[in-house]
Amino acid sequence: AFPDPRLFPLQQLNRSLAQVSKTATAMSVIENLPPGNVELRQAIARRYALQGITISPDEIVITAGALEALNLSLQAVTEPGDWVIVENPCFYGALQALERLRLKALSVATDIKEGIDLQALELALQEYPVKACWLMTNSQNPLGFTLTPQKKVRLVALLNQYNVTLIEDDVYSELYFGREKPLPAKAWDRHDGVLHCSSFSKCLVPGFRIGWVAAGKHARKIQRLQLMSTLSTSSPMQLALVDYLSTRRYDAHLRRLRRQLAERKQHAWQALLRYLPAEVKIHHNDSGYFLWLE
């Protein structure tokens, strides 16, 4: 899901792309092979640091969007035939990825407000030899909930207890409407058990297809997997993002984007209330793109 493309700073990004195209050298392609452009990885690491999360640029692998980050993360910690837990309902792309990699999906009940049922999750962990969980902890697609900090702490502790890797799909974390950006579950990861995946696609520029994974001890393996599949992420797009982020316009753009999305989401909710039958229940939340109807 993407918002109105007019909400993105496409003119500024095109200027950055034109600028780097003039100055790119033959070495640019080599310098941007996995794990990706070092300046871009440093910029992403600084974004983590703003939330008090220490991530080394060496732990970050730049990918062709978040979906590649998620797929590579799955490949790094599973083998065909392994069990992977997903939410019910979950992002359809997760199920497609599991099928393609010949992994078994194990769905766990998920509440519209509270998120994944941790008791049901523990029962699943006790009954099945689960290798990984693919979960969205912030602005979940499609329900829209964000897990509380307390629940994220419990989630990370539970998965660590059973030695199960959390693949955290966090592509909507910048699209919060409150005062503070919600922390990812990665913030409470003390045992290198969370692979945190995100991208610029949902909040800045869908067409560039630039994502990443904070991969920790799995970074080298993910680099090798990427070299064997897509080889690398687009060098011009990486360089253009580095140029744009250096202008310090990103946070101003995010503030405008969040304000406009909140207004549009409110208008959509009001229109649905007005035109749909009374028996239709519309769940509204304070982040992301999604409204859930029952």
Predicted regions and their residues:
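Conserved glycine-rich beta-strand-loop-beta hairpin in the small C-terminal domain of fold type I
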Residues: 259-269, 279-294
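Hydrophobic/aromatic residues within well-ordered alpha-helical segments
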Residues: 9, 20, 36, 40, ...
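Inter-domain helical "communication" segments and dimerization helices
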Residues: 22-27, 246-251, 272-281
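Conserved core segment of the aminotransferase class I/II
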Residues: 13, 190-259
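Conserved N-terminal helix/loop that builds the PLP phosphate-binding region
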Residues: 1-24
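Conserved core of the PLP fold type I
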Residues: 17-162, 167, 173-192, 261
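Short histidine/acidic/glycine/proline-rich micro-motifs that form metal-
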Residues: 2-7, 111-112, 140-142, 172-175, ...
